[in-house]
């Protein structure tokens, strides 16, 4: 399975977008849309600190990293869960795993694989440290249980050269705008050839006269007229 469009946007709402390395709430160096070294390249420690000169370009780069990360976490959830999932359940689990990295050892996964969906939903709240994460965990629990997706706009936050987040929005994206960043525009189809211009009355009359003359000449040739 893959994240739905609403699942992708919900994840961006939870993570936010920071176009430079920053320290998260538990002092893990992070970049872009929740990317850490644990997810693979790039290592946030190797990136320049502070706000980039071109924010729009930096956001596009962060989105490219996000796409690679999402594919990894989707595969992890698909590998850990051995029962059929509804789309909203899968979206909630990927969001949970993207944040915790704990899908393979979580009680909620064991309960889900045992067929205890309600117990799995309850177990989301077993991962509620630090306190700042509780609202997100409740949103993931609600999504898993009821299919209720969060709403809002994905926010691009600033950061400084020390890796501190500056809580002043630099950009915001509606879901359609964020999804457009994830997917390049469709190539334009080749233009259709222009239709032939209709023949003018004068040209048509001249062609008809030439055809009549040719037919008449043929008649004289065959019949000696």
Task: Say what each PLM segment does.
Residues 1-9, 14-20, 26, 37-38, ...:
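Long, amphipathic alpha-helical surface segments
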Residues 43-44, 54, 142-146:
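Short, intrinsically disordered/low-complexity patches at protein termini
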């Amino acid at each position: 399975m893959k994240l739905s469009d609403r699942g992708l946007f919900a994840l961006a709402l939870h993570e936010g977008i920071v176009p430079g390395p920053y320290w998260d709430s538990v002092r893990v160096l992070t970049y872009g849309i929740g990317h850490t070294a644990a997810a693979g390249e790039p290592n946030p420690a190797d990136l320049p600190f502070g706000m980039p000169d071109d924010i729009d370009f930096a956001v596009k780069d962060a989105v490219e990293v996000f796409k690679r990360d999402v594919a990894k976490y989707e595969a992890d959830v698909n590998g850990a869960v051995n029962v059929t999932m509804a789309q909203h359940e899968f979206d909630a689990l990927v969001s949970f795993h993207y944040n915790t990295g704990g899908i393979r050892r979580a009680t909620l996964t064991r309960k889900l694989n045992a067929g205890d969906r309600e117990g799995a939903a309850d177990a989301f709240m077993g991962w509620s440290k630090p306190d700042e994460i509780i609202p997100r965990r409740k949103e993931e629990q609600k999504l898993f249980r009821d299919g209720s997706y969060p709403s809002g706009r994905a926010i691009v936050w600033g950061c400084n050269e020390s890796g501190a987040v500056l809580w002043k929005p630099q950009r915001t994206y509606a879901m359609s705008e964020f999804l457009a960043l994830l997917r390049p525009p469709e190539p334009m189809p080749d233009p259709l050839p222009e239709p032939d211009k209709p023949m003018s009355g004068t040209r048509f009359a001249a062609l008809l006269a030439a055809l009549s003359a040719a037919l008449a000449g043929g008649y004289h040739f065959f019949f000696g007229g």
